[in-house]
Amino acid sequence: MNEQQRLASQQANSSTKKEEKDYSKYFENVYQPPSLKDAKKRGKEEVKIERDFGLPEEFRNFGTGRKFYIRTYGCQMNEHDTEVMAGIFTALGYEPTFSTEDADVVLLNTCAIRENAENKVFGELGHLKSLKRRNPDLLIGVCGCMSQEESVVNKIMQKNQHVDMVFGTHNIHRLPYILKDAMFSKETVVEVWSKEGDVIENLPKVRRGDIKAWVNIMYGCDKFCTYCIVPYTRGKERSRRPEDIIQEIRHLAANGYKEITLLGQNVNAYGKDFEDIEYGLGDLMDELRKVDIARIRFTTSHPRDFDDHLIEVLGKGGNLVEHIHLPVQSGSTDMLKIMARKYSREHYLELVRKIKEAIPDVVLTTDIIVGFPNETDEQFEETMSLYREVGFDTAFTFIYSPREGTPAAKMKDNVPMEVKKERLQRLNTLVNTLAIEKNSRYKGQIVEVLVDGESKNNPEVLAGYTRTNKLVNFVASKSLIGQLVKVKITEAKTWSLNGELVEEPIEVK
C-alpha cells in the first residue's frame, strides 16, 4: 500500500456504520481503525515490493537521548517484527532498555491466537497505567496481531486511554511517523491497515544474538481455518522474491550466523502468488542448500501445501535439517472438515509416509487443538490414535480458544470445559510418554549440537540444539558458544537431553 492508497483507505474507513460509535471526531491526527470485514477480502491488487526504505531528514536524531522497550508475545513472526522495530528505533537514535521504568517508549507487540495471550496484554496495560501517571511523557503503544481486531481497539479506546498509539502488522515501516504523531498528539493515534500491505525490503533489524536468525520468506495466510484469526490479522499470502531472500541469507552467513529459520504463516505456500515464475518452497530450499551456512529450517507448514518436490529436496540433506513441524490440529477427518483444514486424516498420514520415506531419520512435531466445538469422544480418540500412528516426538497442545470474528466462534459448543480439560490431560500424558520414549533412543549416541549459550537453569552448563531441534545440556567452556560441537548423550529427559562434550568444534564447510 503506497501513501496515496493509505490516505484513500483512511478516508474510506473513517465512514463507519451509524450503529457503531465513531471515535474519529475525538482525534486531531490519525484514526484508522481495523475492520475484520475488510481484512477478510482477498483482492487481485498487485502487491508492490518497496526496496527504498529510508528515514527522511526530519527524523535524523529523532530519538537521541531516549530509550525504547519492546515486550513481545506470540510466535516467531512477532519476534522477527520486534527485530525490525528495534532496528527502526536504533536508526532513529533511540537506545534499548530492559526496563519499562527506564523507557521513554514502551511497545507491546501482541499475539491474537488465543484468549490467554490477550489477557496477558491487557494485564500489562493495567500495570503500565501507574507508570504513565508517574511519567506523563512516557509513550505507550500496542502493535501486532491484537491491534488488527476491532474489539481490541475499541477496548483500548474505552478502558485504556493511557495508550498513546495503536498500529498493526502491515505498517511497521511507518513507525517513525506513528511515533511522531503520538508524541505531538493529545489523543491516541490509531493507524491499522485492514488490507494486506506491500512487501517492504531493506528494513533495518537488530537481531537477537549472532548465532541464529529469523528470515521472513512470505507474509499472510489465505487458508481461513474456521478457528483462526491469523488470515485477518496478517493479510493475504504474499511472497518475497527469491533473490532478496537468498541475498539476505548469504549476508547472514558471511557475518557468521550458523542457523536460519525461514518464516511464514503458511511457509509451504511460498511462491504460489508469483505470476511471472513457477517457483515454490522446494525450489528455494534447493538453492539454499548451496549457501555456506550450517543449518536451514522453516516454520510453520500447512499439510495441504506440502508438495512432493519439497519432500524430494529435503531428502537431499546437507544444511537442510531433519526436523519438520507439521500441525495436524485433529486426527478426525470430520473435525478437520469443520475446521476447514482442507485435508483428511488419510491425506495427512500419506504425507507423513512420504516424508519418512525420503528422510528416514526425520523428527516430526505438531500442533493439536482439543475441545473444538462439538468434538465427540470418538473424534478425540481419532486424534489420540493418529498421534500414536505418526509417532510425533512432541506437540504443542491447546484447548480451543474462540476468536471473535471467526466462523468457529459462532458455532454452538456442547463440549463442557471439564471434558475439554480431561481430554487435554489425556493427550498431554500421551505426548509426554512418547517424548521420553523418543528421547531415550538418543542415549549413547553422538549428536551435533549448535551451542546457544548458558543453560537457563545453571550458568555452569551450556545448552544448544541438535539438527532435529532437541535441547542438549552439557558442561564445557563458554568459548564454545556459537560453535557446532559433538556431544555424547548420557541421559534422556522428557523435554531435553544431557550429555558430554566429546571433541573440538566441528568445522563448517
Swiss-Prot record:
[4Fe-4S] cluster 2 binds at residues 221, 225, 228. Residues 1-15 have a biased composition (Polar residues). Residues 1-25 are annotated as: Disordered. It comes from the Bacteria. The keyword Metal-binding applies. Binds 2 [4Fe-4S] clusters. One cluster is coordinated with 3 cysteines and an exchangeable S-adenosyl-L-methionine. Belongs to the methylthiotransferase family. MiaB subfamily. NCBIfam families: miaB-methiolase, MiaB/RimO family radical SAM methylthiotransferase. This is tRNA-2-methylthio-N(6)-dimethylallyladenosine synthase. It comes from Bacillus cereus (strain B4264). The gene is miaB.
